[in-house]
């Protein structure tokens, strides 16, 4: 028999699938598995909640990982555009296992205190420069995978974030040129062990990078699909209750400024992921603080990008 948490997750997924499929104006790139495939493939999600076009079946010469796909640049994207225009048969969503849209990137870069309203809830000043930290790529899991509570932490918290995916190698990128280096956007959950985040001189890495602490997906939405990435509703629900609700227009440093800043220090590569910060409503600043527990279900949703749903185990 299914446990209550598993039943709730399946129920939520069915509700998402029953929503009207939002027409795909452009590309929603995914990595997926299916029973008839021997290995993961790259595909196109046919709108939020829709089925999947198998790009590797459409063109067997295409790479089967998103990082390699992005490394091909315009050559790979042009194939995807042709597949989109061809209105190919879809693999039903019920037959697909969605992976994170990007796995094993060279870097996962994160930004702290990057929402004005998040700074307000902590009663701290808006940073003068971006606060940068990282997660290891081993923390990445798919949009519907479980979040594993580590026995080492008693204070695991939620953070919905918009993630930017790099599409082209670059260093010392000017803010005015940044979007030429961006492939697109996706939904991220910056799961955070607050007790470990505050230890070791407040070096955040250990508290941010436990296995399964970076669910991503469901799709890499190409930049030309989004009219304005800095004016999107962003929210998080825990067991159906809204705990975070804001808009990406509250970001202190926009995508262009963040990437220009980071690229002063490191070379960015195709597939690199930049989490752009979280809005207010995280558990640690509630009175009393609230943290995730086994059986909880977390939904992170961003307008036009989609929703990821992760059970806590």
Swiss-Prot record:
- Cite the cofactor comment: Requires a divalent metal cation for activity.
Organism, per UniProt? Rattus norvegicus
Indicate which residues the UniProt annotation says bind Mg(2+).
159, 161, 190
Give the EC number. Answer: 5.3.2.2
Q: Which gene encodes it?
A: Fahd2a
* Matching Pfam families: FAA_hydrolase (PF01557)
Q: Where in the cell is it found?
A: Mitochondrion
- Give residue numbers for the modification (N6-acetyllysine): 202, 233
GO MF annotation: an example: metal ion binding
Name of the protein described by the UniProt record: Oxaloacetate tautomerase Fahd2a, mitochondrial
Q: Where is the transit peptide?
A: 1-84
What PANTHER family does its record include? FUMARYLACETOACETATE HYDROLASE DOMAIN-CONTAINING PROTEIN 2A, FUMARYLACETOACETATE HYDROLASE DOMAIN-CONTAINING PROTEIN 2A-RELATED
Listed A to Z, the keywords are:
Acetylation, Isomerase, Magnesium, Metal-binding, Mitochondrion, Transit peptide
What GO cellular component entries does it have? Answer: mitochondrion
The main location is: mitochondrion
Cofactor(s) this protein requires: Mg(2+); Mn(2+)
Which residues are recorded with the post-translational modification N6-succinyllysine? 202
Superkingdom: Eukaryota
């Amino acid at each position: 028999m299914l446990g209550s948490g598993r039943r709730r997750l399946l129920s939520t997924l069915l509700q998402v699938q029953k929503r009207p499929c939002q027409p795909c104006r452009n590309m929603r790139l995914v990595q997926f598995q299916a029973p008839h495939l021997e290995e993961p493939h790259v595909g196109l999600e046919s709108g939020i909640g829709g089925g999947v076009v198998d790009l590797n079946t459409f063109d067997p010469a295409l790479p089967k990982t998103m990082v390699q796909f992005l490394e091909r640049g315009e050559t790979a994207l042009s194939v995807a555009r042709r597949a989109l225009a061809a209105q190919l048969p879809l693999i039903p969503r019920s037959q697909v296992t969605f992976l994170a849209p990007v796995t094993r990137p060279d870097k996962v870069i994160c930004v702290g205190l990057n929402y004005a309203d998040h700074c307000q809830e902590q009663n701290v000043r808006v940073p003068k420069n971006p606060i940068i930290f990282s997660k290891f790529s081993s923390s990445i899991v798919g949009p519907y995978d479980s979040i594993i509570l580590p026995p080492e932490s008693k204070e695991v918290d939620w953070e919905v974030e918009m993630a930017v995916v790099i599409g082209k190698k670059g260093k010392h990128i000017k803010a005015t040129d940044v979007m030429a280096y961006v492939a697109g956007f996706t939904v991220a959950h910056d799961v955070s062990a607050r007790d470990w985040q505050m230890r070791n001189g407040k070096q955040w890495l250990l508290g941010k990078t436990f296995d399964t602490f970076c669910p991503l997906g469901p799709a890499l939405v190409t930049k030309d699909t989004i009219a304005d990435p800095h004016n999107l509703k962003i929210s998080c629900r825990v067991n159906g209750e809204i705990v975070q609700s804001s808009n990406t227009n509250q970001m202190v440093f926009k995508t262009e400024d963040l990437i220009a800043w980071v690229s002063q220090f490191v070379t960015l590569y195709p597939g690199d992921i930049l989490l752009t910060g979280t809005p207010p409503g995280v558990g640690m600043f509630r009175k009393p603080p609230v943290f995730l527990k086994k059986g909880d279900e977390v939904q992170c949703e961003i307008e036009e990008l989609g929703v990821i749903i992760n059970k806590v185990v």
